[in-house]
């Protein structure tokens, strides 16, 4: 009969007893009992979010940082405090106390050497998750993650990865690998003459780049020097390629970019100021935004020659009868057309027929004479006359002839229909109709039958006789009579 061998359960690193599946907790590849899964220093219960395993021992993040993290100014308990923790609470079992450097920082502990190319690039030891810092895809100890020159502590913001596979702070990186010369050392504006050790013991001298040394074919190179422009140094302007060194103002030699570059008529580039002085408008109020007279040594003949004036003749191309501009009769093209009352006008001709003020779709008024006018001229020519009309409440003295075509406010011609206006009998069109008790009226006929007051939907009253009245006349004709019912309360009407 075969013997039965039970599967051996894994052992807990804390107590050394077997751990079964119902009570196991995992950390760092080891299995712990649920009761043993707590910090080895402060005995705090742990979970998967706050536990840290180090050499088969469990710690909370705080205790792990205090025991294995860096020591010194800014690292103890919280940033910005001086930690005097010398590790005395971490005495070994034999009572040995680790030596202390400068009274605060622990001596480097013995670190196991990692295989070549896998450990910390500075010390070569294993890097655990609690203390690793990443740079150039490699893991560093937090203690080793400092500038290779000034030994300043670094982080992900201050770290600069150098071509020599080391890390530096920004200042040391700029001094060692950045550009040299006036304006580059220590933030610009200072002459830097630092000499760094080279193979020959002398500083490197950077030769000036001669961009026109390699000439391009005519019409293909840089417009300023004629040299070939490569992709690493090209600047584009108006479809042409420039060297970055040559892309400056032709007059003041100010360095340009895509924002302040202006293409001149001479196919060169200028800054905005020089472009405005040379090609912009001249006169009072135009000089770079200042309110003074700018001459800049230019005569009126030179200014006129640079800015020729062209007055187009709109009558040179005649249109067919009834199709051209109503004012000049010339053909109107799409780029210059203005629309008014179904007619097409030239933009130049679209002005008031009397005062010649330029018009637009807001100011234009179509007159009965087939022409267009501004509002003021339209009111003077075709508007009502008399006291209170016109531009001011003044009495207008004219020839004495009335300008109103229909003095009684009623149409004089047209077909009379049975369903027309109840007052005049003529047909009522949609543009002028007013509705009252299922009957349609002209707008001019829509007034009180007694006092001739104009009516609307708010003061309209339909009388029993089929006519319309205002409220006062309706009450006077059809309302109750007696004390308190007249035009006002408490008045006796004798109708």
From Swiss-Prot:
List the transmembrane segments: none
| Alphabetized GO MF terms | actinin binding; metal ion binding; structural constituent of muscle
Q: In which tissues is it expressed?
A: In the embryo, expression is restricted to the somatic, visceral, and pharyngeal muscles. Within the somatic musculature, expression is localized at the ends of muscles fibers at the point of attachment to the epidermis (at protein level). There is no expression in cardiac mesoderm or in fat body.
Give the UniProt subcellular location, in the record's own words. Cytoplasm; Nucleus
One GO location term (cellular component): Z disc
In its keyword annotation, does this UniProt entry include Metal-binding?
yes
Could you tell me which SUPFAM superfamilies the record lists for this protein? Glucocorticoid receptor-like (DNA-binding domain)
**Alphabetical keyword list:** Cytoplasm, Developmental protein, Differentiation, LIM domain, Metal-binding, Myogenesis, Nucleus, Repeat, Zinc
The residue ranges of the LIM zinc-binding domain are: 12-63, 120-172, 222-274, 325-377, 421-473
Any GO BP: muscle tissue development
Pfam families, sorted:
LIM
**Its principal location?**
cytoplasm
In its keyword annotation, does this UniProt entry include Repeat?
yes
What positions does the record give for the motif labelled Nuclear localization signal?
66-71, 175-180
Q: Which Gene3D superfamilies does the annotation name?
A: Cysteine Rich Protein
What PANTHER family does UniProt report for this protein, alphabetically?
Answer: MUSCLE LIM PROTEIN MLP84B, RHO-GTPASE-ACTIVATING PROTEIN LRG1
Q: What does this protein do?
A: Plays a role in cell differentiation late in myogenesis. Transcription factor Mef2 is essential for expression.
Name of this protein: Muscle LIM protein Mlp84B
Annotated source species: Drosophila melanogaster (Fruit fly)
